[in-house]
Regions:
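C-terminal transmembrane helical hairpin of 12-TM major facilitator-type secondary transporters
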Residues: 317-367
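Helix-loop boundary and gating motifs at the non-cytosolic
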Residues: 2-57, 249-254, 258-283
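Helix-to-loop junctions at the C-terminal end of transmembrane segments
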Residues: 64-78, 308-322, 406
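Hydrophobic core of transmembrane alpha-helices in multi-pass small-molecule transporters
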Residues: 95-99, 103-122, 348-362
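Intracellular juxtamembrane helix-capping segments at the cytosolic ends
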Residues: 121-134, 362-376
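Loop-to-transmembrane helix entry/capping segments in MFS-fold secondary transporters
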Residues: 46-47, 136-146, 292, 375-387
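Intracellular loop-helix junctions on the cytosolic face of multi-pass helical membrane proteins
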Residues: 1-11, 103-110, 121-122, 126, ...
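C-terminal ends and interior cores of transmembrane alpha-helices
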Residues: 86-104, 331-344
Length: 462
């Protein structure tokens, strides 16, 4: 359906179509706050954590562009995007359930690969559905609601271990060799969250069929069966890369620095807090479990800030545009990370996460607003997948290189890794200034043109 013909949806319709994101992000939040401690409990060396995190970017790089391209060319009685997030949520819930019960490092790593493949299968269709169902004026709101869901899910995930601890659930790690029950039960609750939220979106949201359904089905039949669609998906991806708008190519440089830095946060934030604020550098230290759980609190602070920013972002974007919003908010995140070097006080460390949350709200929203403003409607899925590739490639580079300099350049200190993340954010903000104006949503460029015309008319009168 042409974007100009798409009806205005109510807030609750937009809410319902994104509600499944809540459960998916609860799963991601559990992973981000607990995976490094889980790996450490199972015997992983701190300097090798980056390699163990490879599953996320590799599965994202391989799966999201393919799912985007296939779903662009799919229509079933269940819809275009819904079959994919149904499959992803169901398989992901199994991995979430089994992950904390891993008895060996190889088992946890294997389940991590399954979990991230499932999450990536589910996540891209949610992003693409905003482009499918919302017109230009409502897309900023649509992605802001998804930002709220991302933050809400991750807040719940970060808070859950401490809530369970307050209810009397054990945090005993048996000398640093056992995953505590507060982590295990948090993951079990995550399964329920994923399935319930996914079912809600599935039953409350319909998708628009292709404009000419018979012609669309004929085109799909010509592509053959499943393997034929896979082949055409790779062809569509390659053509999309060749035809990629200049604005999207410039976004790549912002993503390069942002997402080279971000893995440091997931890999080392909990460990940095345990080491510097709780004097617990290793899993057998007395306060390690408590310190690592405060990593979850740090993510709560970040995501509460992101929730607040979700309500403010549409107004900020309207006032200064997407490019400047992106740059300013990234600088806030960079300052937050770098400031952690100045204190070991847990309250001040958590306060630094406010700046990170401000930046995170832009990272998970602004690029998608830009992309849907400049790519063809019928190729939104494949370009959303390619946008995720922009995320994955820097992460893979991070995971493969950190081990070479963690003990030398970063002096084996997880806090120094967070400072490097902050520097990357500042460099990404500089790159924002080189993104062309064509990425601005149409309603913003229309406002700018009207203001320029008014200024011209005023000058003529003078």
């Amino acid at each position: 359906m042409n974007t100009s013909k798409k009806p205005m949806l109510s807030f609750w319709q937009i809410w319902n179509m994104s509600f499944g994101f809540l459960g998916i992000q609860y799963g991601f939040g559990l992973q981000q706050a607990n995976l490094s401690p889980i790996f450490r409990y199972l015997g992983a060396d701190e300097s090798k954590l980056a390699v163990l995190w490879l599953a996320g970017p590799v599965t994202g790089l391989l799966i999201q562009p393919i799912i985007g391209a296939i779903s662009d060319g799919t229509w079933t009685r269940f819809g275009r995007r819904k079959p994919f997030f149904l499959i992803g949520a169901l398989t992901g819930s199994v991995a979430v359930l089994l992950m904390p019960y891993s008895s060996a490092l190889w088992m946890a790593v294997g389940l991590f690969w399954i979990l991230d493949a499932s999450m990536n299968t589910a996540m891209e269709p949610y992003r693409a559905m905003v482009g499918d169902k919302l017109n230009d004026k409502q897309r900023t709101l649509g992605f802001s609601v998804q930002t709220f869901m991302i933050a809400g899910g991750q807040i719940a995930a970060g808070f859950m271990p401490l809530l369970l601890l307050s209810l009397g659930v054990s945090d005993d790690t048996q000398g640093g060799k056992h995953i505590p029950n507060i982590v295990k039960y948090s993951f079990v609750i995550g399964v329920v969250a994923m399935l319930v939220s996914m079912a809600w979106t599935n039953f409350t949201t319909d998708e628009y069929p292709p404009d000419n359904l018979e012609e669309f089905r004929a085109e799909q039949a010509a592509k053959g069966g499943f393997f034929g669609k896979i082949g055409h998906a790779f062809k569509d991806i390659w053509e999309a890369v060749i035809d990629m708008p200049q604005g999207l190519r410039r976004i790549w440089w912002v993503k390069l620095f942002t997402w080279y830095g971000l893995p440091f946060m997931w890999q080392y934030l909990s460990l940095s807090i345990a080491r510097h604020s709780f004097n617990a550098p290793t899993p057998d230290s007395p306060n390690f479990a408590e310190g690592a759980s405060y990593g979850g609190i740090a993510f709560i602070v970040m995501n509460v800030t992101t929730v607040v920013m979700a309500f403010l972002l549409p107004s900020i974007v309207k006032a200064i545009g997407t490019r400047m919003t992106y740059a300013v908010l990234l600088v806030c995140g960079g300052i937050g990370f770098i400031s952690m070097l100045l204190t070991t006080n847990i309250t001040l460390v958590l306060s630094c996460m406010i700046g990170v949350g401000i930046a995170w709200s832009a990272i998970i929203t602004i690029p998608f607003i830009m992309t849907t403003s400049i790519v063809p409607q019928k190729r939104i899925g494949v370009y959303m997948g390619l946008l995720n590739a922009f995320i994955c490639i820097p992460q893979i580079f991070n995971n493969l290189t950190v081990g070479f300099y963690y003990d030398t350049l970063l002096k084996g200190d997880p806090r120094n890794a967070l400072v490097l993340c902050g520097i990357c954010f500042i460099l990404a903000a500089v790159c924002c200034l080189f993104i062309p104006k064509t990425v601005e949503p149409k309603y913003i460029t229309e406002i700018d043109e009207q203001e320029e015309n008014l200024q011209g008319d005023f000058a003529a009168v003078k």
